[in-house]
Regions:
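Extracytoplasmic segments of membrane-associated envelope/inner-membrane machinery
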Residues: 95-96
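Acidic/polar-rich alpha-helix caps and helix-coil junctions
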Residues: 1-77, 87-89, 99-275
Length: 275
């Protein structure tokens, strides 16, 4: 943890607090870090995810299998994308996300999606329409065990997207141009022949790119909630039995998780969240 990682995390915190001036100022500082951190290039993008402390990594937890109990132990993001999740169909990529990414067949981020290595061993839920795809963003350092994959807490791509969102919300010609430049740094990295035009810049477009770029990193739900947007869960191979979309709005009581019963028992003044 260093000054750059703290400033990067603060850019996220202030974005969540809707303090866009501070979020943008801190994001700019991190982006102008003197070359210590750099965005992945288009060509290296498919191969960087299992490595320690990549050029984008501002803060990550280090894991190794060379020491006793040195792996993740199933905690954090890496484990949920392992081959041994087989019938955990709540952990596969949603059809809605793959349809979104499929809008551009040449997007380099397709390289991080794969079918199971042994589909004949996968257990498909009743009514599923084909094998699900897993996210291969956490392949492990040797490529065969995700439990030694480091967990990246924040990386430079997110900082660029934080800056894009904060600058857009602040408005004004200079901020809008900067927002577009930050957004296109991510869009054109994914596909060098693609870019967002000035007339296409919107909060919806920025959030769409956040969803594509930061998939599997724990942002999409909170991005929707903090912007007053609903999340729609539709059927597919992960929820084949859902006939109608399950919509969760920011005011939905399910947004606040239940307080553990042990905490309720220990404090008679504790009021349980509605759920």
């Amino acid at each position: 943890l260093n000054v750059w990682s703290v400033k990067a995390l603060l850019s996220r915190v202030y974005l969540y607090m809707n303090d866009n001036e501070k979020a943008l100022a801190l994001a700019k500082e991190v982006m102008n870090n003197g070359g210590l951190y750099q965005l992945f290039t288009h060509d290296e993008y498919p191969t960087v995810w299992g490595k320690d402390f990549s050029s984008e990594s501002l803060f990550e937890f280090y894991y190794t299998l060379s020491e006793p109990d040195g792996g993740t132990g199933g905690e954090g993001a890496p484990m949920v994308y392992a081959d041994n999740v087989k019938d955990w169909n709540n952990l596969v990529l949603t059809k809605a996300f793959l349809d979104l990414l499929g809008e551009d067949p040449d997007d380099v981020r397709h390289s991080l999606n794969r079918l199971p290595e042994k589909p004949e061993e996968d257990i498909l839920p009743e009514g599923s329409k084909g094998y699900p795809k897993y996210l291969n963003k956490y392949p492990g350092k040797t490529g065969d065990n995700p439990q030694d994959n480091d967990i990246c807490i924040i990386r430079l791509s997110e900082v660029y997207l934080n800056a894009a969102e904060a600058a857009f919300k602040l408005g004004g010609a200079e901020n809008l141009k900067f927002s577009l430049d930050c957004l296109n740094a991510i869009v054109s990295r994914a596909n060098p022949v693609k870019s967002v035009k000035e007339t296409e810049l919107s909060l919806e477009r920025i959030l769409k790119e956040r969803r594509k770029e930061l998939v599997g990193e724990g942002h999409a739900f909170f991005d929707a909630m903090r912007n007053g947007l609903s999340v729609s869960r539709t059927g597919g191979w992960h929820l084949p039995s859902v006939a109608a979309a399950v919509v969760i709005s920011p005011s939905d009581p399910r947004v606040a998780l239940p307080i553990p019963q042990a905490e309720i028992d220990a404090n008679p003044n504790m009021v349980q969240n509605p759920h």
